[in-house]
Curated annotation (Swiss-Prot):
Part of a stress-induced multi-chaperone system, it is involved in the recovery of the cell from heat-induced damage, in cooperation with DnaK, DnaJ and GrpE. Acts before DnaK, in the processing of protein aggregates. Protein binding stimulates the ATPase activity; ATP hydrolysis unfolds the denatured protein aggregates, which probably helps expose new hydrophobic binding sites on the surface of ClpB-bound aggregates, contributing to the solubilization and refolding of denatured protein aggregates by DnaK. Residues 341-545 are annotated as: Linker. Residues 766-857 are annotated as: C-terminal. SMART domains: AAA (SM00382), ClpB_D2-small (SM01086). One of its GO terms (molecular function) is ATP binding. The Clp repeat (R) domain probably functions as a substrate-discriminating domain, recruiting aggregated proteins to the ClpB hexamer and/or stabilizing bound proteins. The NBD2 domain is responsible for oligomerization, whereas the NBD1 domain stabilizes the hexamer probably in an ATP-dependent manner. The movement of the coiled-coil domain is essential for ClpB ability to rescue proteins from an aggregated state, probably by pulling apart large aggregated proteins, which are bound between the coiled-coils motifs of adjacent ClpB subunits in the functional hexamer. This is Chaperone protein ClpB. Homohexamer. The oligomerization is ATP-dependent. Residues 6-71 are annotated as: Repeat 1. It comes from Photobacterium profundum (strain SS9). GO terms for cellular component: cytoplasm. Signal peptide: none annotated. Residues 159-340 are annotated as: NBD1.
Amino acid sequence: MRLDRFTSKFQMAIFDGQSLALGRDHQYIEPAHLMVALLNQDGSTIRPLLTMLNVDISQLRSRLGELLDHLPKVTGIGGEVQLSNDMGLLLNMCDKLAQKRKDKFISSELFILAAVDDKGSLGKLLKELGLTAAKIEQAINQVRGGQKVDDQNAEENRQALEKFTIDLTERAEQGKLDPVIGRDDEIRRTIQVLQRRTKNNPVIIGQPGVGKTAIVEGLAQRIVNGEVPEGLRHKRVLSLDMGSLIAGAKYRGEFEERLKSVLNELSQEEGSVILFIDELHTMVGAGKGEGSMDAGNMLKPALARGELHCVGATTLDEYRQYIEKDAALERRFQKVLVDEPTVEDTIAILRGLKERYELHHHVEITDPAIVAAARLSHRYVSDRQLPDKAIDLIDEAASSIRMQIDSKPESLDRLERRIIQLKIEQQALSKESDAASQKRLNDICEELDVKEREYAELEEVWNAEKAALSGTQHIKSELEQARMNMEVARRAGDLNRMSELQYGKIPELEKQLDLAAQAEMQEMSLLKNKVTDAEIAEVLSKQTGIPVAKMLEGERDKLLRMEDELHQRVIGQNEAVEAVANAIRRSRAGLSDPNRPIGSFLFLGPTGVGKTELCKTLANFMFDSEDNMVRIDMSEFMEKHSVARLVGAPPGYVGYEEGGYLTEAVRRRPYSVILLDEVEKAHPDVFNILLQVLDDGRLTDGQGRTVDFRNTVIIMTSNLGSDRIQENFGNLNYEGIKNMVLEVVSQYFRPEFINRVDETVVFHPLGQENIKHIASIQIERLVNRLKEKDYELTVQESALDFVAKAGFDPVYGARPLKRAIQQYIENPLAQEILSGKLETGKPIDLLIEDEHLVTKQ
């Protein structure tokens, strides 16, 4: 008996039978061993065949186990087992049956056919289970679908549709698909193309996230509900699973074999199946090796003959890149374009999906949350499409609330972490004996007592609220199941079941749900069970960094006092501070133009008067950190070709994949302060790029992606006209100086550039009083740095006047002051600290003696 005459599945089963015999210490491989191996085999034909014959497989397994238990055990056979006489006869019988059926290879289902006529123990067992040769013959013909066994992998490629596709109509019947709201025109156009005589293959094209796959799911639901023309009724929509088709195809030709078997089975279905290929472009080039044919070319003949009813889905870019290049494949498909839905349509879609998400997360989603998700995602998430980005917001907001219910609330979690931190510190300090450590230990013990009491109270409240919330979850799940059963009964025409559900169970569950919801209505302090617009805004703020959440009282006060905050670091520039503060307030109050940046400013003035410092202060005010400022030194963009660095190199140039310096920074952090320092030093072509940013708040980078600048503050600084300011300071008022400077600026910048800037602010030169104020700020920073080293520095008024006078230079602004502080204070202090003259913990006085700065302790 030659093993290579068997199919690969049958060969594997024989080897598995041999292992089974060895494991049980049997000397011979009996038919029962092979039968058990065939039943246990993954993807075998035997199990579906026996299921078709109404055989109880678990009963068969237990009876086979009994047969094997009665076989004699032989120890010490050294791992050698042989085929028994019965087994040899059965395999020869299988060979005869294969020849009779004109098969090139012997397949595993013939073993059952041979065994049922056998007079051995397996034959008797099969007869007892009600099997006959005629019944098995009939089932084999059905499984094979009229095909002969022509190659060794024939069994693996059988029932290819079951293995390599997902039945969407079946999932629609079971209620596993999300409802499809709207998209009637696109579904109607898809049905229209499917009804054609030839080229009846629609390809659904649209941006990622607009709902292409949902259209096919909507078609499957309509077929199930009978809401389609007569020509499409009772058809099945099968989704091709490319992953399963390619996975495990190790040898050349194996992938093509699988695809061919799928196409053969589809042609046998005679048009009763619509094949859906998601990501259609993956078919072009799939399985293409050296000289072999790819999947796209294998589909062409079936598509042209109309044997294959196919619906494809792909994005615009991939359609252009893969399918349009292959004109022969493209002409076999008819395009159905899917546009992004409007905000109103998205709200309708979200209302339809609401119940599914409520059921999954066991939370309630309010209508304001749905409206906020659609509107806010449309405005602030510019690089993705509706409805996908709005659904994401709803999903994540519901998930965060569910997480807070299931795990500890954030406030409780923070308290617990703080308690652990204090306990660790307590343990460490208990080993120290010095006075400072003991003082800190007492403070920690007091704080620990307070925190532990607070934690115990909060935990009690949390447990009570959690118990109250779990009431409605069970009722909601039951109600959803009852509605699904109602739909199944409606399709089956079971009127008794329908009336029982519609007038009995469903109203009763709805009543229970209302009562449970009323019990939940009392205000909860820790847990929430509702997704509101505030949660949506919070999730969006976390995703994009743009503050769209409702302002808390503290933030309102902070914005109203914004000038005072900025004046703490920027001295003597009232106009500039006011202009910037007003722009930020307009934005946070929601009054700024949604299609332009929050504010764009051109800061003009001499060096060292606080132009760059104001930008840093603004970034610090808005984000609590100067790191969120995108600083671009325009002196680096003096050559014409350096413009490409801002938006990214064009295709074909080195660095094309890397993206632009400005565009990438804003894509990653859409809410930021952009400082274009020394803007007049840049090449004039740079300003042409800035025109779109200042007017429309958008810029297209080197890769064709639109970058959104609508949530940025753009500040450009320049020294233009600073000589005029110095000459006329004191002679003219602010307006007069401003007009003179703008005259110089208009000669340098184009009118269309100046016209797009929201406000041009001219900075004042700094006077003696301003310099003194700045000196006190900078010395205060030095005092704080020394405090960290345990030195207490006190600066006398006379010393402050001395430094301010030494650092005053009307031409260079505040920068000479920094040098004066270094020269007169920091350098002598550093020397005295290093030489050991100054001791820690004792006060140090900085004062004037004989017109010199001296330190005394």
